[in-house]
């Protein structure tokens, strides 16, 4: 699976969250991920429509990555949509070039997650506020993926940022990023790769083996719990 990450940010080089996400992609991930920063590619705002459409056709998952300004995207990403997602390409007669692909969002958000719910400062959920993107996916025949929302990156601890790094890599590369089992398998594969790279350091190998065993034991417990629940409903 190939993923195209379309980044829109008026000052991407000065953005702490965007630079963290860009640097979070390991060499292993970059083989299947294309980063495409719009403002750096088109500083004059003139979109190469044919090039953009070819990029879309050559990837399976399309990600819009941007700061969530006024419940929408920065202006260049909206302009990109107007120019690139044209009739006869993305919709309409023979406009099926995006059909079967996936559309996801990576949103950097300045407020706390609790504010995006009934009773919160914003009063609406992220799911409600991103309905226009869900509509784009529906109109173009793409499958919409639940957004990866990053709340208050500047206040995240080092541990929280490490968790974000893993979620981000999984969101871009896993076939089912919302499913628990593929996420577990991804972590186990990454740990085994780390063990191979640190071969010869017995202490590190032991810790990694213990973590893998713990994950697999938890999975077995979850499978047993699901079995009991299924039997109860029968």
Explain the meaning of each model-derived region.
Residues 16-20, 47, 75-79:
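Generic recognition of short, well-ordered alpha-helical segments
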Residues 51-134:
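Helix-loop-strand module that forms the ligand-binding subsite of alpha/beta enzymes
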Residues 42-50, 157-159:
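Structural motif
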Residues 150-234:
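C-terminal and late-domain segments of enzyme folds
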Residues 4-6, 34-36, 63, 104-106, ...:
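Hydrophobic/aromatic beta-strand patches that form the interior of the parallel beta-sheet core
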Residues 30-43:
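A short beta-strand-loop structural module common to alpha/beta enzyme folds
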Residues 1-31:
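N-terminal beta1-alpha1 ligand-phosphate binding loop
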Residues 102-104, 110-183:
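Conserved, surface-exposed functional patches that form binding/active-site neighborhoods
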